């Protein structure tokens, strides 16, 4: 399979280039960065593109890829419901093209989201803390937002988190994502980390995941690349590729 990388000079993108080049069953075609023409992907007969760019350009990238029949594995953040709907509309005209967008490709992070969803209905309270390097463009992270939504879905019909806070500084209790408080930390020295804290009478449960190096994303991305043709249309997350019940 012939694979190109968008954002190839970024920290994650460069890691993806190295990962593709090291895979015996994949052929690296080209790396594209800001200012480079996307047409190079067509010229090199690229079949699948890995996109780790920026929310400001990812939609233009996807429009080009879909129109040219190139599958996409996307780790870029900033996808709203409206953006996802637009991607689905573009894909209607290209039913054989596959796009997979994931908030996190680290296997441990995906498992932690799954475990949090399973635990959610068994605890009275839950909050999410995500911690990242200070160069991250979005807050909360896509992983934290998705985690919160999965938890909220699992807690449907349950009372909201007990919280007697009546006064305080704006934002002190975090962002509200479908009723789940999410707190964002940006700190030099961090890569990508998340804690989900559950509490109920007499006990707490903490589910934590740490990506200490960007190579943690490579196995999940390459899994998505290898499976991309099997799921035409838009797929969110890599959970379905991991056979999580």
Swiss-Prot record:
It is found in: Cytoplasm. SUPFAM superfamilies: Glyceraldehyde-3-phosphate dehydrogenase-like, C-terminal domain, NAD(P)-binding Rossmann-fold domains. It catalyses: (S)-2,3,4,5-tetrahydrodipicolinate + NAD(+) + H2O = (2S,4S)-4-hydroxy-2,3,4,5-tetrahydrodipicolinate + NADH + H(+); (S)-2,3,4,5-tetrahydrodipicolinate + NADP(+) + H2O = (2S,4S)-4-hydroxy-2,3,4,5-tetrahydrodipicolinate + NADPH + H(+). It comes from the Bacteria. GO terms for molecular function: 4-hydroxy-tetrahydrodipicolinate reductase; NAD binding; NADP binding; oxidoreductase activity, acting on CH or CH2 groups, NAD or NADP as acceptor. One of its GO terms (cellular component) is cytosol. NAD(+) binds at residues 7-12, 75-77, 102-105. The keyword Cell membrane does not apply. This is 4-hydroxy-tetrahydrodipicolinate reductase. It is an enzyme of class 1 (oxidoreductase). Pfam families: DapB_C, DapB_N. GO terms for biological process: diaminopimelate biosynthetic process; lysine biosynthetic process via diaminopimelate. (S)-2,3,4,5-tetrahydrodipicolinate binds at residues 133, 142-143. Belongs to the DapB family. The active site is at 132 (proton donor/acceptor), 136 (proton donor). Keywords: Amino-acid biosynthesis, Cytoplasm, Diaminopimelate biosynthesis, Lysine biosynthesis, NAD, NADP, Oxidoreductase. Its EC number is 1.17.1.8. Catalyzes the conversion of 4-hydroxy-tetrahydrodipicolinate (HTPA) to tetrahydrodipicolinate. Pathway: Amino-acid biosynthesis; L-lysine biosynthesis via DAP pathway; (S)-tetrahydrodipicolinate from L-aspartate: step 4/4.
């Amino acid at each position: 399979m012939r694979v190109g990388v968008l954002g190839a000079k970024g920290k994650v993108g460069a890691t993806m280039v190295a990962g593709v080049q090291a895979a015996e069953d994949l052929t690296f075609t080209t790396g594209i960065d800001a200012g480079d023409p996307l047409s190079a992907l067509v010229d090199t007969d690229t079949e699948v593109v890995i996109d780790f760019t920026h929310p400001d350009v990812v939609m233009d990238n996807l429009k080009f890829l879909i129109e040219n029949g190139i599958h996409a594995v996307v780790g870029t953040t900033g996808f709203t419901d409206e953006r996802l709907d637009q991607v689905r509309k573009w894909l209607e005209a290209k039913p054989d093209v596959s796009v997979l967008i994931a908030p996190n490709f680290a296997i441990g992070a995906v498992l932690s989201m799954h475990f949090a969803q399973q635990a959610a209905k068994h605890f009275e309270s839950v909050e999410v803390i995500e911690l990242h390097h200070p160069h991250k463009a979005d807050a909360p992270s896509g992983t934290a937002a998705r985690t919160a939504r999965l938890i909220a879905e699992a807690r449907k019909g349950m009372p909201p988190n007990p919280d007697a806070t009546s006064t305080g500084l704006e934002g002190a209790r975090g962002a509200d994502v479908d009723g789940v408080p999410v707190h964002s930390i940006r700190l030099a020295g961090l890569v990508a980390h998340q804690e989900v804290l559950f509490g109920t009478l007499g006990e707490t449960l903490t589910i934590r995941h740490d990506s200490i190096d960007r190579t943690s994303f490579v196995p999940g991305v390459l899994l998505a690349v290898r499976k991309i043709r099997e799921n035409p249309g838009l797929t969110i997350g890599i959970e379905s590729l991991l056979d999580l019940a």
